[in-house]
């Protein structure tokens, strides 16, 4: 590798460390010509094939940005979003393929998001799964309730153990969840929020 300081074509590695998540390698290099030291980061590329057919490199920050929109107004910290983004990337990399469809990224987000916050899950799912009316919301809410019942019945002492499987950016403009003060046609969720479909 060329030295970024003197452009000498030869540098040597003096230290190598694997990142905590195991997905990248940090190397410390030294230039024998000018003596300068610098670091490089090596990582495998994970590609995402979009519905348009275009292929782009997976970006964990895009996952976090998309989920952050669904979590607006919810008691979710930035650290929670970072952990979810890491879970999504780990899940996709664990599949052992170099390229994944964008739909699979969405599915990988939904699983841990449901465990993190059910309201945010409904917001994200409404866009990812293209909800068209209140009936779609009702089906999603019923599915949430059924999954909660299964978890409780399967665990001793009434404590459900959630299996957080590792979970791209979607625009959150089609649907919103507002406080129970609105007068429009709506439906109240178990968490005390009114689900209202809106168009933009």
From Swiss-Prot:
Pfam family, one: ATP-cone
unnamed zinc-finger residues: 3-34
GO BP, one annotated term: negative regulation of DNA-templated transcription
Cofactor(s) required for function per UniProt: Zn(2+)
Keywords for this protein: ATP-binding, DNA-binding, Metal-binding, Nucleotide-binding, Repressor, Transcription, Transcription regulation, Zinc, Zinc-finger
GO molecular-function terms, A-Z: ATP binding; DNA binding; zinc ion binding
UniProt superkingdom: Bacteria
Cofactor info, note text: Binds 1 zinc ion.
Known role: Negatively regulates transcription of bacterial ribonucleotide reductase nrd genes and operons by binding to NrdR-boxes.
UniProt-listed HAMAP family: NrdR
NCBIfam families: transcriptional regulator NrdR
The protein, known as: Transcriptional repressor NrdR
């Amino acid at each position: 590798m060329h030295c970024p300081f003197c452009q000498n074509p030869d540098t040597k590695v003096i230290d190598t460390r694997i990142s905590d998540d195991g997905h990248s390698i940090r190397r410390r290099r030294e230039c024998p010509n000018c003596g300068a030291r610098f670091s490089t980061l090596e990582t495998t590329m994970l590609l995402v094939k979009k519905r348009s057919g275009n292929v782009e490199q997976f970006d964990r920050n895009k996952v976090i940005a998309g989920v952050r929109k669904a979590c607006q107004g919810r008691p979710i910290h930035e650290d929670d979003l970072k952990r979810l983004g890491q879970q999504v990337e780990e899940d996709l990399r664990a599949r052992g393929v170099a390229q994944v469809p964008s739909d699979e990224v969405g599915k990988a987000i939904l699983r841990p998001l449901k465990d993190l916050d059910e309201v945010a899950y409904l917001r994200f799912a409404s866009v990812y799964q293209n909800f068209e009316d209140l009936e779609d919301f009702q089906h999603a809410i019923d599915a949430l309730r059924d999954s909660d019942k299964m978890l409780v019945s399967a665990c001793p002492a009434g404590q459900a153990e959630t299996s957080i499987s590792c979970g791209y950016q979607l625009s959150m403009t089609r649907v919103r969840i507002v406080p129970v003060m609105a007068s429009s046609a709506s439906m109240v969720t178990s968490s005390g929020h009114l689900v209202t479909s809106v168009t933009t």
